[in-house]
Amino acid sequence: NGPLAGLTLTAAVCRHRGMILGEGAQWERFPLLVKFIDANDDLSVQVHPGAAACAKHFPGGHSKDESWIVVDAEPGGRILAGTRPGGTREDFVRALEAGRVEECLQSIAARPGEVFRMAPGTVHALGRGVVILEIQEPSDTTFRLWDYNRLDDKGNPRELHVEQALLSMRFEATRAVEPQVETTEWGRRERLVRAPVYEIERLHIERGFTWETATDRPQVLVVLDGALTVEGGGESLQLGPGEAVIVPAALREVVCEPEGETTVATSRPTLDPGTG
């Protein structure tokens, strides 16, 4: 809205780089990708490399660190996150060749509200019937390990990237994040993830307050439950479940007014993307 009305995010960043990105004005693009994923089938088992793996094995590749907030899950919905304790690379390769790769992966029942960080090198997959909010580095470098023998639109097996994935993998399990909870005058703040390239918090807002961003970097607010009016810079927006707003770096405080108890996820970059 305001001077940015009608612009795509890419165009807005190009035209108002300093206002939106603040001290990150040198970034080539907006430093976060935030989206909902609603899995209507089991998604492919994949892994993303870290910066070190890209530098060593994949010149031109880009690291990807991502986190998931489980929004909804059907009965039996699950997440595959990391390898089972005690597993080795050799075990994994044998299982992969036999089409039994899931036996080597940690399967976790998906519970709304739980949060998982998929650090670079973590093998992961989203199961059917699970809805997540995904916050990540904007990167297309993905290596697919297993895709349940599915075919592409031409009837061919979908491409796998086993060799690249094995060079990127970390053979370790992943657990749900334990939030650091702080009671406030307006409700409750949960510090969820502090990764090298982003931070995530969850705000349970019971009454209106002025949110001081306390950083010269942009932030993304996503309403998970309830409704919220945000005011700042002479503008006002009403947000419902699933709706989001980017708070530019130049806007140092925002007035938040909930309609009943409202839950909001916030994320912001912490380093230049690609350094994690």
Where are these regions (language model features)?
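Ligand-binding loop in jelly-roll beta-barrel domains
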Residues: 38-42, 50, 73-76, 122-142, ...
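Short histidine-centered beta-strand/loop micro-motifs
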Residues: 24-25, 56-59, 191-192, 210-215, ...
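Short acidic-glycine-tyrosine-enriched beta hairpin
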Residues: 105-117, 131, 232-251
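Acidic/His-leaning functional-site neighborhoods
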Residues: 178-243, 251-252
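An exposed, glycine/acidic-rich loop-and-rim segment of catalytic or binding clefts
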Residues: 104, 115-117, 122-177
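A generic structural signal for well-ordered coil/turn residues at beta-strand boundaries
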Residues: 30, 41, 63-66, 75, ...
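Active-site glycine-rich loop that binds ribose-phosphate moieties when present
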Residues: 87-117
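Transition-metal
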Residues: 1-87, 147-175, 200, 273-276
